[in-house]
């Protein structure tokens, strides 16, 4: 696997680390449990990063030195793709030919390197975009920076070259087809999974006590990177209209605009709700489950979201979700059953949606909503994701092998007989 711009070992909620990190790591771990050896190549971001990290039996992370360890923005990473690709190719060269059977690249930067590796190693390239520039640019938040044309060009190249594409939802498949003219026959859907052993219902009062929150009252949680794309400000602005609501924000800075906790702290002060907002740093997976268990509902107001893993993890804990009706969130959340979908980012509409869902969650329907959320989340197990990944890999290998054999047959059929000409003065 290739994950250039962010390590699967990074703490989600910090910098560029988020759902993709969880996806790469968990899919690798579950593939290894099926007997598939997985090596993940990522860019080293600190001098202390060891070249090799054994995460679990069958899962190896290779930290490739490509560019400076610090101060390199994600938008500058295209300048380091040559260095990263060199590190990947050198690692393969240390093995016997044919060591790798398939390349699975994540995000367009990795796809550029995967394209080269595919051609050098003669193995199929499977690519997961995770997000698309055109989709993000069509729904920019105030203060967010547009994705550069370079990315759109790079994404198109990867789509053209990939042997198969794996997407999170049918909606993402339609986007690939309409925006990048992807071949529908080469697209497979594999919903991201959730760790159902870790994310499960728990005692709400105990969870609140563990986080130092008041045991009574309504709590709405926002979990994710603090950036305009994720729209944490919408949650605070909605809370300003709901005096009975306490907000928990768990995440670290990323992106531009309102991209720092300090920015949200100032916004809370301006709105006069500082006493009702608790800011937490990015949480470990175990602590994240505690946050979900402590909340009456979880808000996911993103402007674009290819899936929305946080929404599924929250529901696995029995907590309903109010989410923006964008991207994969209508798949992650069953509107009117496990939560509420909100169209647009009008603060008044969000305040109404939060208020109504809180009332339902506190009424006679509370148990039914919680149970429905758990049942819905159960279909997004990592075992199901792994089944879908393996099916896609098999198709990729089968199609790639058949194509190569067909090309060899065509080459043999069209090759002209070779004529051997003896030159005067040469021995027999």
Curated annotation (Swiss-Prot):
Binding site for 1D-myo-inositol 3-phosphate: 5, 16-21, 74, 107, 131, 151
Binding site for UDP-N-acetyl-alpha-D-glucosamine: 11-12, 19, 225, 230, 283, 305, 313
GO terms under biological process: mycothiol biosynthetic process
Keywords recorded for this protein, A-Z: Glycosyltransferase, Magnesium, Metal-binding, Transferase
Pfam families the record matches: Glyco_trans_4_4, Glycos_transf_1
A molecular function (GO) term: acetylglucosaminyltransferase activity
Record's catalysed reaction(s): 1D-myo-inositol 3-phosphate + UDP-N-acetyl-alpha-D-glucosamine = 1D-myo-inositol 2-acetamido-2-deoxy-alpha-D-glucopyranoside 3-phosphate + UDP + H(+)
Residues annotated to bind Mg(2+): 292-293, 295, 319
E.C. code: 2.4.1.250
Gene3D superfamilies tied to this protein: Glycogen Phosphorylase B
Origin superkingdom: Bacteria
InterPro entries assigned: Glyco_trans_1 (IPR001296), Glyco_trans_4-like_N (IPR028098), Mycothiol_biosynthesis_MshA (IPR017814)
Role: Catalyzes the transfer of a N-acetyl-glucosamine moiety to 1D-myo-inositol 3-phosphate to produce 1D-myo-inositol 2-acetamido-2-deoxy-glucopyranoside 3-phosphate in the mycothiol biosynthesis pathway.
NCBIfam families in alphabetical order: mycothiol_MshA
Protein family according to the UniProt entry: Belongs to the glycosyltransferase group 1 family. MshA subfamily.
Quaternary organization: Homodimer.
Record protein name field: D-inositol 3-phosphate glycosyltransferase
């Amino acid at each position: 696997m290739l994950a250039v711009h962010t390590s699967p070992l990074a703490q989600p909620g910090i910098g560029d680390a988020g759902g993709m990190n969880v996806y790469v790591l968990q899919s690798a771990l579950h593939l290894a449990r099926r007997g598939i050896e997985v090596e993940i190549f990522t860019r080293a971001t600190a001098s202390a990063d060891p070249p090799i990290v054994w995460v679990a039996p069958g899962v190896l992370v290779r930290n490739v030195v490509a560019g400076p360890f610090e101060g390199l923005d994600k938008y500058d990473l295209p300048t380091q793709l040559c260095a990263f690709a060199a590190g990947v190719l050198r690692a393969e060269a240390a093995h016997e030919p044919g060591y790798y059977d398939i390349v699975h690249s994540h995000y367009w930067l990795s796809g550029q390197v995967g394209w080269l590796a595919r051609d050098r190693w003669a193995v199929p390239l499977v690519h997961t975009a995770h997000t698309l520039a055109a989709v993000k640019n069509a729904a920019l938040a105030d203060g967010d920076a547009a994705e550069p044309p370079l990315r759109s060009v790079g994404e198109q190249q990867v789509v053209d070259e990939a042997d198969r594409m794996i997407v999170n939802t049918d909606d993402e498949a339609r986007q690939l087809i309409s925006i990048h003219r992807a071949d529908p026959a080469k697209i497979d859907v594999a919903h991201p999974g959730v760790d159902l052993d870790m994310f499960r219902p728990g005692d709400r009062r105990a969870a609140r006590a563990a986080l130092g929150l008041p045991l009574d009252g309504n709590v709405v949680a926002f979990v994710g990177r603090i950036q305009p794309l994720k729209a944490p400000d919408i949650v605070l602005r909605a809370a300003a209209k709901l005096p009975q609501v306490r907000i928990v924000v768990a995440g670290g800075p990323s992106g531009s605009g309102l991209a720092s906790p300090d920015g949200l702290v100032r916004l809370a002060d301006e709105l006069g709700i500082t006493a009702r907002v608790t800011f937490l740093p990015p949480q470990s997976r175990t602590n994240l489950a505690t946050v979900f268990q402590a909340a009456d509902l979880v808000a996911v107001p993103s402007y674009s979201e290819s899936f929305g893993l946080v929404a599924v993890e929250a529901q696995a804990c029995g907590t309903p979700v109010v989410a923006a009706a964008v991207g994969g969130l209508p798949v992650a959340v069953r509107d009117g059953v496990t939560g509420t979908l909100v169209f647009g980012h009008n603060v008044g509409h969000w305040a109404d949606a939060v208020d109504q869902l809180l009332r339902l969650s506190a009424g006679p329907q509370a148990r039914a909503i919680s149970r429905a959320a758990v049942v819905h989340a159960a279909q997004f197990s990592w075992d199901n994701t792994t089944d879908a990944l393996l099916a896609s890999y098999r198709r990729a290998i089968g199609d790639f092998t058949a194509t190569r054999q067909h090309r060899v047959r065509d080459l043999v059929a069209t090759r002209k007989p070779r004529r051997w000409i003896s030159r005067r003065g040469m021995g027999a």
